[in-house]
Amino acid sequence: MAKLFRNYNTLVEYEADTNKPVNTICFIKDAKVIYVDGIQYSYKQLDYLSPAISEAEALEYMGKIIKNAQEVGLIYVKPVPTIYWTGDSNTISINYNDYTAESDSIIIDGVEYYQLKLDKDLDNDFYLFTNNTFTNLIFKDVDTSKVTDMHEMFYNCSALNSLNLSGFNTSNVTDMHYMFTNCSAITSLDLSGFNTSNVTNMMFMFGGCVALTSLDLSGWDTSNVTNMTVMFHNCNALTSLDVSGFNTSNVTNMMAMFYNCKALTSLDLSGWDISKVTDMDSMFGRCNALKTIRMVGCSQTTIDKIKAQLSSNGITGCTIVTE
């Protein structure tokens, strides 16, 4: 919880009756109330306080801010706060130097917060939820239209079992590498609404999603992607995967792309062009259950490359379907 509130000069009065760790904070501007761990308190705007409480003085904030061993009843906020998540478990942090806010809301675990307005000029969103222990994230009216970098956004969210990103605007995103890596509890992802037309890097994007049984990537435009290294590495619960819509004409690296997808029995690579791929090492390594690969509309060169990889990876009994 260290650094939970920092670098603010605009203060509000906060009347707390506990001294426990704060896990969730919700500000509702018009109602002039604040919810801390589901408990409602009122607040009012205070004038600038000089000297302001420093970060060091607020370091041990646990529901109240303590200054010189005395409770001062103040927290650092601004009238319209923006909320984002730190790497601490179940911690919500507020930092006005990094993000801007709008007046709409975001719903996290059924709790309504102010909208996250994520600005491309302000460090983007990589690492945003990294290493958190949330089990469910539901976004409502989250503005991601300016974001260009989402790499490692949900990295190592090992408890996350539900994630709805249907409202995400990814039209300006160029980097999604490691975005969902090690989300080991999630079983289903529908990312069909993602606009990936500007993405160039998808390396290890779903690596370590060991519980994933359903993955919808239909409608993806991957025409600018160059790196698909270990993209589905260790997705060992997937039984089928349709990536026939992928435009792979600019991809140069597919090393270990499906490595250890040990439950995978069918794969649709129809329409793929891998003429620029220079590294396919271990592309199907340990995919020993693979029985069918659809390659409708693929050139003979592409088909031969895939067959060569299957052979070098020790995959036998897999049928290539071309019509």
Per-segment meaning from a language model:
Residues 1-17:
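Short, intrinsically disordered N-terminal pre-domain segments
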Residues 2, 17-31:
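Extracellular repetitive beta-rich solenoid segments
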Residues 2-4, 24-25, 64, 73:
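Short Gly/Ser/Thr-biased coil->beta-strand turn/linker motifs
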Residues 5, 46-60:
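Fibrous stalk/shaft segments of extracellular and virion attachment machinery
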Residues 7-10, 54, 68:
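Alpha-helix N-cap recognition
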Residues 15-22, 110-115:
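Beta-propeller blade-edge signature
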Residues 25-47, 66:
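Short, surface-exposed terminal/edge motifs of secreted or surface/virion proteins that either
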Residues 58, 62-323:
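Negatively charged
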